[in-house]
Each structure stands twice: as C-alpha cells, then as structure tokens.
C-alpha cells in the first residue's frame, strides 16, 4: 500500500485521513480514562502519521505505528517498522512482528504490569495483543478468533462500554 502513496504529499494524505469517521464518543471516553489515571495510546499497524493525527485529535499519550517515509513532505513509498513490533527474548508469541511486543514495551516504559493493561482491537493483527493484555476487548470485529479470545466484546460503535471495565 505504501508504494501506492508514493508521490503524494502529507497534506493530501491528511485530508483523506480527516474524512475517515471516528467513533463518536472517542474523545469523551479517552478524557474519562485519563481522569481515572489511565495512560491512553494508539498502537497501529497503519502509518504513524495517521495514528499521530488521531492521537492529537483524541489527546492520547502515545502512538506506535509503522513509519511511512517522507522526503520534503512527499511520501517515498517506503515504510519502516518500529523495532517495538519485533520479536525479542521477552516475546510471548512466535510472530516476528507483533503488537503484543509493543504491549511489552509499553508495560516496561510506563511500569505497568501487562495484567493492568486494557487493549482494544478489531482485526486478526490484534489477537496476540488482546490475548496478553489484562483485559482484551474486541471492538466491532468480524474476526471470530479475536472475538473468541477477547475477555470482552463490544458490538456497537461506542467506546463507552470500556468505562465499565476500566475501574
């Protein structure tokens, strides 16, 4: 996909991102989670500039995502996968690149035991992350495996039910 973006400038790409509808109560729920003392972040296998834009919009604390490379504001079509996704000796799954590895990094960085982490995901790429989080929440997912391993499942386009689990 990155090669299809080659030659486009960041302003063009962000205008497309701006058209993607967010879950309506996202900002409200993030605000409430932060009031409760939670650190809120975006871990995405999409591109960092998209995740960073969302982070800023919802006032999240961090973002970790793949880096679409730019030269003078123009996409080069190349992508860097941050080392946080890479398998290490501490990895709990066998994938070479996995969001569960990012979860371990976040756990160490913020000194939060994995059992105290709530992870929310919607695709097959979130399975390991949800599996190893304290509470794994499947959000509006059609993936049967993700739904089966999740501790909780949300089937409506609202993040408010997360507040019931985030005490």
Annotate each predicted stretch with a short phrase.
Residues 1-12:
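N-terminal helical cap/lid subdomain that shapes the substrate entry/recognition surface
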Residues 17-42, 46-167:
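C-terminal cap/substrate-recognition subdomain and adjoining C-terminal extension
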């Amino acid at each position: 996909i990155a090669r299809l973006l080659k030659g486009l400038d960041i302003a063009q790409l962000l205008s497309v991102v701006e058209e993607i509808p967010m879950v309506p109560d996202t900002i409200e729920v993030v605000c409430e989670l932060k009031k409760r003392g939670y650190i809120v972040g975006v871990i995405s296998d999409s591109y960092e500039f998209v995740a960073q834009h969302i982070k800023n919009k919802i006032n999240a604390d961090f973002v970790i995502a793949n880096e679409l490379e730019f030269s003078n504001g123009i996409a080069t079509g190349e992508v860097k996968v941050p080392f946080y996704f890479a398998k290490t000796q501490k990895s709990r799954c066998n994938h070479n690149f996995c969001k569960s590895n990012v979860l371990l990094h976040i756990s160490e960085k913020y000194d939060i035991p994995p059992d105290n982490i709530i992870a929310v995901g919607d695709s097959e790429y979130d399975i390991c992350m949800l599996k190893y989080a304290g509470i794994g929440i499947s959000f509006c997912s059609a993936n049967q495996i993700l739904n089966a391993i999740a501790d909780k499942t949300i089937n409506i386009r609202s993040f408010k039910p997360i507040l019931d689990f985030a005490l």
